[in-house]
Structure formats: structure tokens, C-alpha cells
Amino acid sequence: MAVSNASVVLSPNLETSSSWYHHNPSSSLDLIRIHTLPMNKMTRRGLIQRVRCETSPSSDSSPLDKLKNSPAIDRYTRERSSIVVIGLSFHTSPLEMRERLAIPEAEWPLAITQLCALNHIEEAAVLSTCNRIEIYVSALSRYRGVKEVTEWMSKRSGIPVSDICQHRFLLYNKDATQHLFQVSAGLESLVIGENQIQSQVRKAEQVVKQEGFGRIISTLFEKANKAGKRVRAQTNIASGAVSVSSAAVELALTKLPGSVSSAMMLVIGAGEMGKRIIEHLVAKGCTKMVVMNRSEDKVAAIRKEMQSGVEIIYKPLDEILACAAEANVIFTSTSSETPLFLKEHVEILPPCPADYARLFVDISVPRNVGSCVAELDSARVYNVDDLKEVVAANKEDRARKSMEALPIIREETIEFEGWRDSLQTFPTIRKLRSKTERIRAECVEKLISKHGNGMDKKTREAVEKQTRIIVNNILDYPMKHLRYDGTGSSKLRETLENMQAVNRIYELDGELLEEKIREKKDKK
């Protein structure tokens, strides 16, 4: 039986993820269908592994692809810098773990600086949202790099390495690239096609570029934004798509015994998520609500955008308990790293005005409403992971839309990987010149030592000049075949195959890796 050649490390508790779909186009639809079937976790995992194992590598793989994927000859993937994503998402990990690992946007630059200081990490980027925490790195050694990043995540969050390993997913190179492109396009979102994730990917790109942390990862995120835009422009993936905010409103309304017009609504947080909640509440017929925020400016701006007849009352955050006492439904979407509501806060609130349990819908990560609040009979608490029941109704439509987007994702992935592969020839050219120059210099030095004082300065200069000419002439033909001019994939494949041959013949792979590690240690 042929085995899929995807470089994915599965954790024991890993659930399905659409990042697996691209390993073989013919198996993509089967995997999406498996993901949407009602079954327990063990059954689903078994079916997925069966589908993936029955997938054979493409018969028209280039020699370079065969070299990259050969189990016997993996120097290419071991010695070249690898793009790696170490991630945890709502597919693979509980909310309790994700909120401890979450990195606020304001701390992304510091996190990137710390990651790039690790011995085997050249470049890094952070993507932390309510549904995922993903670290993208360019690693000198994929195995050491993964180990260092995982230990960094453990140290930062206080979660044991073993627990992170149990729930993380790892993707390398092309798989990591395609995964990010799918994330940007909304294919990996809880709500397929939602737009907010693309703005979050764009923010991650801006942070990487502002901090100047490397060309590979910044270009990766730049191309991910391009892929996301193409998918939304050229497919129907965003048509009728709900967002996390709209799903939160839908969930609240399904749990609300009375009508939306008679319920007292409290929205805490007027950022992008909070604004979307307000818009969806208005669309559902809510004409009055209280909105709390650190400052009134954002609330005033939202109020101006709303239609006439909608009353939005601003309250400062220090009045949170007084406002909560008057509300039937409370939405929270702030960036606070500590809970706004704990059990001791909620249990002293007067009974809900309509004499039923007060609803808390918390779409923040870390959570704004402590899990202990759910222990109270007077409160019903829902978080981002509870939104799955809202979006479960349109699984078939989501699967169809995902299939529309995959050809674009594959095309963009091939383009980026071609660009990245073309960069690999430059270190080879530099190292080949360095090695031949070292050999030439050693031979000239031996010649001079042998003849001693019998060689005058003029003769020495002539020897230096002629030996350099000889070396340059010898290198002329290899160098021509190591330079990629950007004219097509077939030329690129040929160039990369030549590069691998030169690396192998002249034993440059180990030297390239050692040089990079030495340079990084020198900088530190």
C-alpha cells in the first residue's frame, strides 16, 4: 500500500483539520465528508488515516520531489532551512489550553524577538486568535526548532511540554505554507469563509515586517493575504458566511426565551468583534442596548453608523456589575487577560429581570467569563467552542465551498514554494565558491612553501592570478546551471536538481547548516 508523503506529525488526540486536505487533491473531498459525519473521535481518526494511507504519490513527481520525499535520502529536508508551524486550534485542543497559550497582539513583537533568539530559529511569526495559536518559524533544524519552540511555549504558559505535544499539530514546508493559505482564506475557521481571520493574518504580516524579522516568513504571510483575497474574490466562500460574532448572536437568540426586542442587551467591548455583535443584534431587531468600553470614542463611532431608531447607551467599565444586574444577555469580547466576571461577582447580582437564567456569551480568548460562573443556577455561560452547534447546520455547504477554494490555494502554494526553492541556490553558489577558493589558496600556499625564496613577488602574483582564472573557468558551467532566471517551473526544477547534485558531490549540505548555526551563535 502506498503511503502519503505529507510531512505531518499527528498527536494522539489530533482531530481532523482541513490542513490535511491538500496532501492529495483526490482525497480532499473524502476528508471533508469524514469531518462532517456524526461519529466519535476514534472512529473519525481511523477513517482519516485510512483515506490518507490509500493515497499514492503522484506518478509525475519530479526527481526533486522524489528526493525531498525519499525516506532514505532526507538530507534536503534535514539540512535546508524549514518552514514549520507549531499550532493548537479548536480542532485539536480545548479552550482551557488555548487561552493559557494565547499571545495578545501587543506582545507579538516581543514573542517574535524571543523566538528568533532560540538557537535554531532564524525567523518567526505569531498568529493568535480566539480559535488558534500558531507559531510559524524558519528553522535551521526542523527537529531542534520544534523542540525549542515547544519548550518556549511551555515556559511562557506554564503548560507541561507533554501536554502541549499531546494537542499540538506540526506541519512542515509546503504543508505549513498551504495550511496558512487555507487559514487566511477562512477554510480553517470555525465559520468557513469568515473575514476576520484575514485581517488577523494581515496584522501578523505587518508585525513581522515592522520588526524586520526576515524575508521568508514575511513573504509567506504576504502571499497568504493574497491567497485569502483571491479565494474570496473568485469563489462563493464568503457568500452568506456567518462570522464568530454573528454566530454568537444566533446562539444567544436560540437560548433566549423571550423576544430580542424585549430583552436587555449588554455588550462589553467595542472592538471589531464587539462592533459586529452590535450590527447583528440590530439586524435581528434589537433597538436598545448598553455598550461598555474603556473609552467612549469607539462607541460613539458605532452609534453614528447605526440606523435611526437604534439606541446605544455608553457606560464605562467601572460600572460593569451595575449594568450586568439590569441585563438579560451579556456579550463579552475584550482583550482582558483576566476574567471580568467570576462566580462571586455573578452570584450577588439580582435575579434576571425576566426571571430566567442570565445568558453570558463570551467570545474572548482568554475568557472574560470565568468557568466557575457556569456553576450557578442563575447563569448560563457559552464560549467560542459552544458556537459549533450554530455552524453545524450548513456542513454540506461548507464542504462544497471549501472544494471551490482548494485549486486557488494549491496554485498560490506552488508559486510561493517555487520562489522559496529558488532562494536555496544562493547559499550553494556562495559555499561552492568558498570551498573552491579555500582549495586553491591551500594549493598555492603549498607551492610557495615548497619553492621558498626561489619565487619572487611578481611570480607569486602571477600564480595567484592564473589559479583564480582556472578556478573561475572551472566554476563557470556549474554556476550557469545554478542560477534561476524565474522563467517557469521546469527551469526551476532543473536548477534545484543541479543544486542538489552540487551539494552532494561537494558535500556542501553539512557546511551550509554549520555556517548558519555559527553565524547565529556569533550574533548572540
UniProtKB/Swiss-Prot annotation:
Keywords: Chlorophyll biosynthesis, Chloroplast, NADP, Oxidoreductase, Plastid, Porphyrin biosynthesis, Transit peptide. It is found in: Plastid, Chloroplast. Disulfide bonds: none annotated. The lineage of its organism: Eukaryota, Viridiplantae, Streptophyta, Embryophyta, Tracheophyta. Substrate binds at residues 129-132, 189, 194-196, 200. NADP(+) binds at residues 269-274. PROSITE patterns: GLUTR. Pfam families: GlutR_dimer, GlutR_N, Shikimate_DH. This is Probable glutamyl-tRNA reductase 3, chloroplastic. The record marks 179 as: Important for activity.
